[in-house]
UniProtKB/Swiss-Prot annotation:
GO terms for biological process: 5-phosphoribose 1-diphosphate biosynthetic process; NAD biosynthetic process; organic phosphonate metabolic process. It comes from Escherichia coli (strain K12). ATP binds at G10, P11, S12, G13, S14, G15, K16, D17. This is Ribose 1,5-bisphosphate phosphokinase PhnN. The lineage of its organism: Bacteria, Pseudomonadati, Pseudomonadota, Gammaproteobacteria, Enterobacterales. One of its GO terms (molecular function) is ATP binding. It catalyses: alpha-D-ribose 1,5-bisphosphate + ATP = 5-phospho-alpha-D-ribose 1-diphosphate + ADP. One of its GO terms (cellular component) is cytosol.
Amino acid sequence: MMGKLIWLMGPSGSGKDSLLAELRLREQTQLLVAHRYITRDASAGSENHIALSEQEFFTRAGQNLLALSWHANGLYYGVGVEIDLWLHAGFDVLVNGSRAHLPQARARYQSALLPVCLQVSPEILRQRLENRGRENASEINARLARAARYTPQDCHTLNNDGSLRQSVDTLLTLIHQKEKHHACL
């Protein structure tokens, strides 16, 4: 049995890390949250990730140890091939993905892919970016502009303006609905 790869996307500040952290706290026997390999210090940012040097990253990529990889915001990101084992064992796997690299995920996982785009209103997004304090005003404006102009096609939209609990419940409902549909195919 093949699980689904849930490719969670959204602009920086949309709440992806908070959503993933909350999901990790809930008991989900068939849903695994994948960690990412990133060329960023382990203490930088709020994301639970595995920090790699660029050399380590390129070594893993060169040895085909990354199922998916991409470059964004001056960093390299990757998801290990272990997710393929999890999917083939029947687990659903949730990945903090990239909007720009959705086509790469579609090409590899095809019908097993469930793309979900996390969205928030511009006002809330600005507030979140300002509160976390990682970007200056011009960087925040650039992120807001990119968020406004780039929403992937053919993906499920999940609004994250409300409570974190509500967003997690909605995401789990979507995943379970797709499980039923997937089982009927």
